[in-house]
Amino acid sequence: MTEAAPDRMTLVLGGARSGKSAYAERLIEACPAPWLYIATAQAWDEEMRVRIHEHRARRSGSWQTLDVPTALPEAVAAATGPVLVDCLTLWLTNLLLAEADLEAATDALARACAAAAGPLVLVANEVGLGIVPDNALARRFRDAAGRLHQRLARDADRVVLTVAGLPLTVKPSRENP
């Protein structure tokens, strides 16, 4: 399936294995290459190594991959062409584990996204649809993710929720309705 070129900033949300990354890749691939894939995942275990390998194997040679566990605002600010960030959820996890200031990091990322030089597609897991977590750390993470998503959705030109591989437009674009 071919997608229309993305707007200046598109936020793609969805659950685990919902098809959000593949959809985001199709959006960026509608732009002239080369494309930059900013990956935030860290291979903590074998399952993550396999997931990272699968994601990389799916992409063509026109993609450049930049592994950025925590310095995401700086990487977005330095990019000069079409960028896919996958994913904000793991970036937030990395920051939480590093005991970083999540509010300051959210602000820095929002500023970098607003000033991005080219089309930007951001991917994140929607984690706020389930039950209330039973521990403080998980609740803090869920709340921080919700605040991050709200901030970026407000600034985004378009917001899409992927469910079962289907993109559902939550915030339509004026340019690509």
Over which residues does each language-model region extend?
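Short, well-ordered beta-strand core segments
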Residues: 35, 83, 158-161
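Short, hinge-like loop/turn segments at secondary-structure boundaries
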Residues: 54-56, 82, 138-140
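Helix-adjacent hinge/juxtasegments
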Residues: 57-105
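Conserved P-loop
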Residues: 2, 10-78
